[in-house]
Amino acid sequence: MNYFEGTVLGLVQGLTEFLPVSSSAHLRITAALAGWDDPGAAFTAVTQIGTETAVLIYFRRDIARIVRAWALSWTRREMRKDTDARVGWLVLLGTIPIGLLGVTLQDAIEGPFRDLRLIATTLIVLGLILGGADWYASKGRPRGRHSLPRPRKTLRDLSVRDGLLYGLAQSAALIPGVSRSGATISGGLLLGYTREAAARYSFLLAMPAVLASGVFELKSIGGDREGGDGEEVSWGPTIVATVVAFATGYAAIAWFLRYISTRSFAPFVLYRVALGLLLLALLAGGAISADAGAAAD
């Protein structure tokens, strides 16, 4: 990987990490279409340190408040009923499923899960699920001849059950093409949360798992380590990609939260389905192979 590739992939990572379109799928597809080597799961995980740093800075006041309340809840019983303390505990609870599955499925994540046929399929399927969840969230409750707005939850309503279900939804993002934010936001909408609450909790929930994964994969960068193509993944381009991902990721968070406050997820649904169908067409036509850029067995 050279510095130009690192810059482009960092830009892709930052622009797509927080949108429900799957950053890992876009990194894989971009490299395949450009004729580059597969950057690999380790590169993806490390560059996500940049985007999660953007989350830390963007939500710094919320995070500081949550951490403080969570810490106080260890010694002060009354704090255990505090919303921020509960969010802190449930973020940790929701991280357990993806942590366990990430370790168990590591070989699949770095190998079969990166098959472009699987990625195309998950782009389409999760896109349809997101569309259904968004439709459900906007659909009114029938009452006689009329329909009333469906009551929506906020983070104040977050329960242990919901926290665990959010965590299970996040686990699906181990497959490129699913999208961490897409899966957790869809889950949140189906559980009855507002778009804004589902998105905010999605970003907060991702931090422990993504940062831990990125730090864990640092050992796979540089030296004699290899990416998905069997070639060395160098430190220089990876650092550049991470910095670019941070800058573009911060802008993407701000834009996305403003966007969903007044609009639906329909454009993202259409984009996911169209991209998945295009990818399947390219694969069927032989323009690219399902394992393009991957290491040979």
Curated annotation (Swiss-Prot):
In terms of InterPro entries, this protein maps to: UppP (IPR003824)
Q: What class of enzyme is it?
A: hydrolase
Q: Where is it found, in Gene Ontology cellular component terms? A: plasma membrane
Q: Which UniProt keywords apply?
A: Antibiotic resistance, Cell membrane, Cell shape, Cell wall biogenesis/degradation, Hydrolase, Membrane, Peptidoglycan synthesis, Transmembrane, Transmembrane helix
- Substrates-to-products reaction catalysed: di-trans,octa-cis-undecaprenyl diphosphate + H2O = di-trans,octa-cis-undecaprenyl phosphate + phosphate + H(+)
Predominant subcellular localization, coarse grouping: membrane
The record gives the membrane topology as: Multi-pass membrane protein
A single GO molecular-function term is: undecaprenyl-diphosphatase activity
Subcellular location as annotated: Cell membrane
* Cited HAMAP family: Undec_diphosphatase (MF_01006)
Give the UniProt family note.
Belongs to the UppP family.
Share any extra remarks.
Bacitracin is thought to be involved in the inhibition of peptidoglycan synthesis by sequestering undecaprenyl diphosphate, thereby reducing the pool of lipid carrier available.
Tell me the function of this protein.
Catalyzes the dephosphorylation of undecaprenyl diphosphate (UPP). Confers resistance to bacitracin.
User: What's the protein here called?
Assistant: Undecaprenyl-diphosphatase 3
> Native species of this protein?
Frankia alni (strain DSM 45986 / CECT 9034 / ACN14a)
